[in-house]
Structure formats: C-alpha cells, structure tokens
Amino acid sequence: MSHVLVNVAWPYANGPRHIGHVAGFGVPSDVYARYERMKGNDVLMVSGTDEHGTPILVEAEKEGLTAQELANRYNRVIAKDLCDLGLSYDLFTRTTTGNHEHVVQEMFKQCLENGYIYKGTQQVAISPSTGRTLPDRYIEGECPICHAEGARGDQCDACGNELDPDELINPVSKINGETPRFEQTEHYFLDLPALAEANKAWLETRKGWRTNVINFSLGLFKEVKPRAITRDIDWGIPVPVKGWIDNPNKKLYVWFDAVIGYLSASIEWARRQGDPEKWREWWNDPACPAYYFMGKDNITFHSQIWPSEMLAYNGKGSKGGETGPMGPLNLPEQVVASEFMTMEGKKFSSSRGIVIYVKDILARYPVDAVRYYISVAGPESSDSDFTWAEFVRHNNEELASSWGNLVNRVANLINKNFGEIPPLDEDSMTNEDRGLLEEASAAFDVVGSSIETHHQKHALSEAMRVVGDINKYISATEPWKIKDDQARLGTVLHVAAQAVSDANHLLAPFLPHSAQKVWEALGGTGTFSPLPELKEVEDLDKPGFTYPIITGDYELGVNVHPWKSEAIEVGAMVPKPAPIFAKIPTEAVEEELARFDEALAARRAAEAERLAAEKAKLAAE
C-alpha cells in the first residue's frame, strides 16, 4: 500500500459554484481518488473554501453583511453542493479556521527567516470613491504585452502572462467603472527570483504532465519578479511580524494563504483523527506523490507560487536556509489542470447569468448523469462546451439505454429464471463466454492505466466499450430463447452478470451513486461505493466557531471494493430490478434553454441597473 495525496483547488466563498467549476477541480479529482482507493492505496483528499480577500469584502458590503457572515453562508452552500455531487473528501474545510491561520503564519515566519520574504514598497490600486484597495482581478484594462482588452490586474487570459494592476493600459474598476489611483505602500514580498532556479529545475524533472500545463509552467520563468504577499485590507490573516500583527489594515494576501490550505487541511484532518502527526505520512515522505487538481486559470499558483513557498520553507532556494518544523515538504508530483468549459457557446459568468449552479442541476437531474457528462464531455485537455442537448443525449443513449438497460435485462432474466445468481457450468462454456470474461477482466489494466495518466475520457470510453460488448453478448446468446437447457441458461446469465459486475467496478469511480444500485441489483449487500457526508464540527482552536466539513469512511475491504474482478456470489438473491437510470424527456432541452435565456436577461438588466446607480452616485459626489 502506498500513500497518495490528492489536493483539490479551493473554491472561493463569494457565491455558489457552477458546473464549469466542478468540471475542472471537482469530478476529475474524485474519480482519481476513488480509483486509487480501489487500488488499495491510502489516499488523503483535502480541500475547503477559500474565504479571504477583497472580493468577499465587496460582495459582503453589497449584501449588508460582514465578510465572515458572507463566508459562513457560502461555506455551507458550497460544502453541501460538493457533498451532494459525491466528492469523497477526507476533509473539506475552510481557510478561516484557527488551524489554518497558525499554519500560514508558521510558513510565513520560516520563509522570512530563510530570507525569501522581505519588506519593500509597491504601487497599489485605490478606489477614489471608497479609499479601499482594489483587488488585482477587480481591475481590467488593455494588456501591455499582447494588447488584448479585458486583461485583469493579476493576469491576462489571452496570453497567460502575470501582470500588476499598474501595468494595464487604461485600467478601470470592474466594481463601478471608475479609474483607480495608484499609491506606494509598504508590503512584504516573496522573492520569487531567488527561488526560480530551484523551481524551474524541479519542473524540468516532471514527467507525464499535460503538454499545455508543463509548457505554460515553464513559460512563467522567462521573467520572474518578486510578488507582494500582503495587502492593505482588514479581512485576512494577520501578518506575523512585530508592528504588523496588530495592524487591522495589513493582512496576508489571499493567494499566499490559500495554497497553504492543502497543508493546513491535512494537519486539521490528522488532528481530528486523534493522531496529530499523521499528516506527515503524506507531506514529508518523498515516496508519497501529491496530485493537484484545478482549472487552468490556477496553474500559476500551483506550478510556481506554491512550489516556491515550499522551497523557501525548506531552505532550497539560492539563499539556502533551514527547513522549518513542518518540513521538508513534498513538491507536487503532478499539476492536473483542466481547460475551460463554456455553456451553450458562452463563457460561464455568474454576474452575467451565464451559469448553471451545482445545486440547481442536481435538483433537476440525477447526480451520476451530471458526473457522467462532465467525465465524457468535460474540458480535460481542451476547452469544451456544456449544452443541454448533449447532456440529455449522453444520459439517454449511454446511461439509460446502454448501461442501465443492460443491468436491468440481466437482473430481470436472473430474477425471472432463477431468483438468485446461477452457478457457472464449465462444461457448457463457449469461447464466446470465456472471451467476454477475459475482456472484462483485462479492462481493469486498460481503464486503470488511463486514470493513472489522467486520461479519464479514454478510461470512461474503454469502460463503456465493455458495456457495449456485454450488450452484444446478450443479443448473440439470446438467453430468453434458451428453454430446455438450464445449465446453459445459467452459464450465460452467470457470465453476463459477472461481466456486468466487472463493468460496474470500472465505472464506480465515475458513477458512485449508481454503482451501489448495480451492486445491489446483482445480489450484493453492504456498501459498495461509499459516499461522503456532511458533519458539523467545532473549530479546534476557536471555541464556539462551528462549520460543516465533508468527510467519509472509505476503507478498502470495508466500504471500498478492490480494483479487480470480484467473483459474484452464486446463490445470492437477485430481486426484481428497478430502473438504474431514467431517460430525460427531450422537452427538457427547450425548457432549460428558455430558463437560461430568462436568467441571462434578468442578470443583464440587474447589472446595468447596478452600474448606473454606481455612476450616478459618483457623479453626485
């Protein structure tokens, strides 16, 4: 058994998450974690809500809430949505815990002691109307490098380069359209140039990364500049330096603290297990690989920023230094970044109403239909488009008609003719029988290899190919016509049931909810595919502060079945089957498109009204 660390990008707690978000960080990470558990590996899968930074302050102000109140609201919303989606976190937590604050400050202090954090000045954008510092991504303008419009103050999506707000040409605030003013203020900086050589050398040893991810990551080192890691803001983690720690208007920058969440969540998980040092098995053992799942807009933070922080903490940059008490910390084995998903040809945008939230789609459609569509049509290595027509087609043709109907046919024939799993009569077996069993068994290596190399679309297509071949076997053997040879009928149905069971194992990482139903349809008892649960807990360091976590029991041999062909149990009672998947009426496509258009129009009207009010307010002042 090996240890495997699965780190999942932290959703920002300024609103509910939509289907484009979970297509990048959610379902792919869960498929991988479930597969590794079935392989017998000891997986630690962690994440949580990212809750600091100016965007939360801005949204809270709009709603008349404190930043903590807004974070509390969306922490609960997001945790429930991700739990309902079946994402099997060992711990899904948040960044406003006392534990996270302690770990972040420990990281900062060791990096400072090693010389990789220093004090300097930087121009920051200020809102003339409020006097508040504007977050980088709330400023837009023309990119100074590729001259694309709509570049943000932290990055240009068109060319992928990192930017500072004062580099933009004709910058404006996304909040109210005003032109920001820039002022010099004192900040702490992470000395990325002093870490660049070690960071790049590590990147050059990476193998098996998606081409777009490794090429983009290496491109970050053409020009490396120090990055400010503090902000003039009253919402965030205090800066652990004398003269700063008690300053209410100086906090650590959200991107510095958020990536440390992988480590702090692992430590919190260990503390909640009653074994406070257990996290080290995943973070300090160089043999333990760490896989990071996210959308491509987060590549920079996981192939440059977070590795640089760990190198600084480990004392492995050009300035040397001592490894801190939490180290040495393992750098990522692989950064698994998906591309972007659009919706009906348009870029997802909550503010513009181009969105389908996780909660809404799960309220109307089965969870595994959503997971299947993301897996088969998601943005694995190129941008993809969510369309309602394709969502319905994949569900109806592949899940309901092909897979679900197959399970029902086999279970119904067994129930009707035997009532239990019939024995296999070796004497009546044909080459066709043996061929199907061999194919289904061999598929574990094929599908598993594709999941291990993060080609989940190919893995799913191979699993569904097995489903297709079982359907062909049923059509060719025509068990409903075997009237006078019970031994042969039993053999055909046993072979079919065994192949269906194998296919169910292959599909379980993708379709955990229906996998349980298929298991039970073939006479299985107990848990086959464990699901996560929400639990209300109290903060380990802040008495009275409570919040929900996602956790679960995913122990191999108890709640998790192995990644191999398991012999079905002869004599296991097979009940009259119920449908595993239902077809979605084709009328749903037009209904969803109409709902989408209505929401889009309403959001546009509301946003136009809000901007007009902001401009009128500025004009009056």
UniProtKB/Swiss-Prot annotation:
Binding site for Zn(2+): 143, 146, 156, 159
Cofactor comment text: Binds 1 zinc ion per subunit.
Pfam families, sorted: Anticodon_1, tRNA-synt_1g
GO cellular component: cytosol
Segments carrying motif 'KMSKS' region: 347-351
SS bond list: none
Cofactors (names): Zn(2+)
EC number: 6.1.1.10
Metal-binding keyword on record: yes
Keywords: Aminoacyl-tRNA synthetase, ATP-binding, Cytoplasm, Ligase, Metal-binding, Nucleotide-binding, Protein biosynthesis, Zinc
The keyword Metal-binding appears for this protein: yes
GO molecular function, one term: metal ion binding
Compartments reported by the entry: Cytoplasm
Binding of ATP, residues: 350
Similarity field: Belongs to the class-I aminoacyl-tRNA synthetase family. MetG type 1 subfamily.
PANTHER family for the chain: METHIONINE--TRNA LIGASE (PTHR45765), METHIONINE--TRNA LIGASE, CYTOPLASMIC (PTHR45765:SF1)
Record note on quaternary structure: Monomer.
HAMAP family in alphabetical order: Met_tRNA_synth_type1
Protein name (database record): Methionine--tRNA ligase
The species this protein was found in: Bifidobacterium longum (strain NCC 2705)
Gene name linked to the record: metG
